[in-house]
């Protein structure tokens, strides 16, 4: 992004729309500055110290790119949509959303309103971003569109590795298949949603062959990822159909210009963004020193999730200063886990364990088995970490250790009952000392198998690295992403 683009964005937000009689404009603190950081990307820093509880950004509703505003902009050209909004908004006038006529606005004229209102927010915004980008300077949103990342900037999101027409797609697919299973599963789920959304959106163009709107997959992907990575929570008005469907929650999103430059941490944020009556506001939750970044918090998400959704992780793995071939962590995401659900579930699939499974389901302890970080400390450049199985994982292993014949169904209580020792452990009367030794043996066997699989993947990544061209930066970047996610698991195994 050019500096001139960010300047133009702020000018756009700070200049009232000529058709707006209320002269609505954004209010952004002069103490803030957009920075294009080499490692963190676009971000916002403080020019001067900012105190706690300071309102630093106020973006009016007019500049929020969300479901309702898209409908309003299209309604200037579409009579059916104009009527729909007039019936629901008092004194509504589409004149505020006037823009130059072009082939895209001709398409807006003929869009079927009922078909449009069936879209989720993600689908509608994908459709709208693709079309508005084609309008160029004719679009009201032109300053925002110029500041959105280009498609190559999403290259670290794994789902993008097996889509598109890159001449290195075969190599990227090999690298993708070496990702941890959980990341592959999440990426495939994202791809399924992407293709479902774009198929739905594409149906708007099949009936308009007279217009040149042949949308490429890359255009859809750019728009879809922009929305997926840069949206904030936004409660839609209840009079919109999308507010009453099963997609209500996933459709409660908006894009917020300028605010979307704020970077995120898993914890220790210094600002909070929230919907307000006038639009969207950002307030500091701690003092922000001169030169410091403004941070929001993502919440308790592990690196797998962050890599899939946003294309980065919060753990930092670097070459050791004293040994170039050794790797060392300078930060580690405390929400990282080792997934054991598939392995333990397979052990429970034994027909003899049917009563055990029923008891686990009854108590709410069936599934979601992980090893997590107990404690983590960085001291003089080294990381000291301890990891342990979650309580529900320990309960499941204890249930596997017990004789399945001791699990019974009580006709009196109409409930499944477990052995007394397990009942006391489950109820929290002890810490499961009775099972500790056997639990450790089972875990050790499981973790050695996982570690062996991870080492095999690292070996294959080395083979791919040796095969690719030294100047193939795209493939090298993807290899590094996979290596880090694998090493996250390996270092946790060593810390159990």
Q: Whereabouts are the PLM-identified features?
A:
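Long, positively charged leader/targeting segments at protein N-termini
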Residues: 1-63, 68-71, 132-496
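Eukaryotic helix-linker segments that join adjacent hydrophobic helices
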Residues: 65-146
């Amino acid at each position: 992004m050019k500096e001139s683009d960010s300047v133009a964005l702020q000018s756009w937000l700070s200049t009232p729309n000529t058709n707006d009689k209320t002269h609505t404009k954004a209010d952004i603190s002069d103490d803030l500055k957009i920075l294009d950081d080499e490692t963190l990307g676009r971000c916002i820093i403080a020019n001067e110290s900012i105190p706690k509880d300071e309102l630093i950004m106020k973006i009016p509703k007019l500049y929020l790119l969300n479901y309702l505003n898209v409908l309003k902009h299209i309604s200037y050209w579409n009579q059916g949509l104009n009527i729909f909004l007039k019936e629901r908004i008092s004194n509504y006038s589409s004149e505020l959303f006037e823009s130059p006529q072009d082939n895209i606005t001709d398409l807006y004229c003929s869009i079927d309103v009922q078909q449009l209102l069936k879209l989720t927010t993600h689908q509608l915004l994908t459709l709208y971003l693709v079309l508005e980008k084609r309008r160029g300077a004719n679009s009201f949103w032109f300053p925002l569109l110029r500041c959105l990342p280009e498609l190559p900037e999403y290259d670290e999101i794994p789902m993008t590795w097996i889509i598109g027409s890159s001449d290195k797609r075969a190599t990227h697919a090999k690298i993708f298949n070496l990702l941890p299973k959980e990341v592959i599963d999440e990426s495939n789920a994202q791809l399924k949603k992407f293709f479902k959304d774009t198929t739905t959106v594409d149906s708007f163009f099949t009936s308009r062959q007279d217009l040149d709107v042949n949308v490429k997959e890359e255009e859809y992907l750019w728009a879809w990822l922009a929305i997926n990575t840069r949206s904030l929570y936004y409660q839609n008005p209840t009079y919109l159909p999308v507010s009453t469907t099963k997609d209500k929650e996933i459709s409660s999103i908006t894009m917020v210009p300028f605010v979307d430059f704020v970077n995120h941490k898993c914890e220790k944020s210094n600002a909070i963004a929230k919907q307000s009556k006038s639009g969207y506001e950002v307030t500091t939750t701690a003092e922000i020193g001169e030169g410091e970044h403004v941070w929001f918090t993502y919440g308790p998400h592990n690196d797998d999730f962050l890599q899939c959704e946003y294309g980065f992780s919060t753990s930092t793995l670097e070459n050791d200063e004293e040994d170039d071939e050794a790797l060392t962590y300078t930060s580690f995401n405390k929400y990282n886990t080792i997934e054991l659900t598939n392995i333990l579930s397979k052990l429970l699939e034994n027909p003899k364990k049917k009563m055990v499974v029923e008891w686990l389901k009854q108590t709410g302890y069936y599934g979601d088995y992980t090893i997590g970080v107990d404690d983590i400390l960085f001291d003089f450049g080294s990381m000291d970490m301890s990891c342990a199985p979650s309580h529900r994982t320990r309960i499941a292993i204890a249930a596997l250790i017990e004789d399945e014949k001791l699990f019974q169904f009580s006709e009196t209580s109409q409930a499944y009952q477990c052995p007394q020792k397990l009942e006391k452990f489950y109820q929290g009367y002890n810490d499961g000392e009775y099972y500790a030794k056997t639990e450790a043996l089972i875990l050790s066997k499981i973790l050695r198998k996982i570690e062996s699989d991870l080492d095999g993947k690292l070996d294959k990544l080395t083979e791919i690295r040796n095969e690719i061209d030294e100047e193939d930066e795209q493939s090298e970047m993807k290899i590094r992403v996979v290596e880090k996610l694998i090493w996250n698991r390996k270092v946790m195994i060593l810390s159990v």
